[in-house]
Amino acid sequence: MIFLWKGANILYRHCTTEKTAAQQRLFERTLLEATHHQPYQDISVSQLCQLSGLSRKTFYRLFENKEDVLVALIDHTIMEYETFIGPSDSIGKNILNEPMNYFAYWRCHKQLLDILAKTNKTALLLERSVDHILREQREVRAHFGVDQEPYAEDALLFYVSGMMSLVIRWYQSDFARPESEMVELLNRLLYTPPVKHAKYISK
């Protein structure tokens, strides 16, 4: 196994075998299921091991701590968007072309959004979403030998961070608007000059 991502007090491992990948995902599902019955902060590593039927030794081969399980769950949820929408050359391309799917996907993952909101970790979802999209785009360009257009990553960063911010605000409103209205709002924000929104920003 090799380290997949390391940050402030966050470390989990990229699995190179089906067995370890399955164990990692089992811990993630167990954490998600456990939050049905008790707050995230009250769940211990020992509980995750007991509920999953896996040992503490296995846990610490895959994660440093419980928070890393949550980060892995976020990352893998982001990655599974590709499965939700079907095959494509680029996840970023689908987000740009099919925002309706993106909003629908995150409505389906309300439980994860609940955990992040209750633990004040919503910003982590935004950070991991942007990192994943940029990394995925770089890999696609490298694979096909495509040169990067000027400001391409800046534009993608602007779009994805804005779109995920809309998802978060939509969640905070308890998904008060249908997906179609969220897409309409997104289009207005994208194609209306910023000065048009100044009167709302100043209030």
What are these regions, as identified by a protein language model?
Residues I2-W5, N9-E18, L26, L48-L70, ...:
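Basic/polar phosphate-binding segments, predominantly the helix-turn-helix DNA-binding elements
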Residues I43-S44, D114-L116, L125, E179, ...:
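Short, hydrophobic secondary-structure boundary micro-motifs
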Residues A21-L32, H36, Q41-V45, Q50-G53, ...:
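An amphipathic alpha-helix adjacent to DNA-recognition modules
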Residues I2-N9, R169-K203:
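C-terminal peripheral helix-coil segments that are non-catalytic and often amphipathic
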